[in-house]
Amino acid sequence: SSSYISPEMRALDTQAKSAGLALVNEVGLDPGIDHLMAHYLVENYRASAACNTANDLSFISYCGGIPKIPNPFRYKFSWSPFGVLKALASPSRSLRNFKEFTGDRPWNALSSYDAPLPAPETFEVYPNRDSLPFMEQYKFDPDWRVKDFVRGSLRLNGWAEAWTDVFREIETLKGPEGDQRMTEMSQEFWTKHAYGPNDPDRVVLCVSLQAERDGAVVWHKTYVMDAWGDENGTAMARLVSVPVSLAVQA
């Protein structure tokens, strides 16, 4: 599965191993390819001469599926709008300047990110879900000084402004009636803002690890992917389904 590991799935781990079964999750794009990049960065840093417990580390991982040709809404849907809206109603947890940062809503934690693409481009980014458990998953040493650590979503510049009315309404939704209204919004967005058969999509993924000491950068590496859809299919479908199929084949 390309989905995050659920508590129910995690609880089956011992039972599956005893039965000789492999339950494989988080092997799509995000989560998936981003995990590979993160592990490579951490191992590269650990093996470098610059690795030192006196360093201050900053880790970011931003991923987003966006229209290749920007539209006024600054977004198009390649999957259920309900999932996107539900994520916007969820809090996030990350590290910012050595302190735990909790965002009640993504738009309240929005920042700007200059992606180091061949043609540099600025995006809007925000933390997604709970980033902190991934420090252990990516094998950050417990004695490393981690200044910033965030896994988040990436959007086109102007996204927050275009979605202002959406944010305002989401803040008012509560209980079963709120879920019903979110379902209605999802249907409306799918009608108005879904990708058409000839609409090219784009996926941008940036994963970076930087080490500083006394304010000077001593080690820095970033992995970047900028993929576009074409006549053979969308970039999102390719980058999610191919890794899953490779995992199944393995």
Protein language model regions, located:
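A broad detector of short, well-ordered amphipathic alpha-helices
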Residues: 14, 36, 242-245
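Short gly/pro/ser/thr-enriched loop/turn and capping motifs at secondary-structure boundaries
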Residues: 5-10, 30-34, 66-68
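Glycine- and other small-residue-rich loops at beta-strand/loop junctions that grip anionic moieties
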Residues: 2, 26-30, 34, 123
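Short, hinge-like loop/turn segments at secondary-structure boundaries
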Residues: 15-19, 42-43, 77-78
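Active-site-proximal alpha-helical scaffold in enzymes
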Residues: 35-47
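Rossmann-fold NAD(P)-binding glycine/threonine-rich loop
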Residues: 2-23
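C-terminal catalytic/substrate-binding lobe primarily of soluble NAD(P)-dependent oxidoreductases
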Residues: 44-250
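General beta-strand structural signal in soluble alpha/beta enzymes
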Residues: 23-25, 61
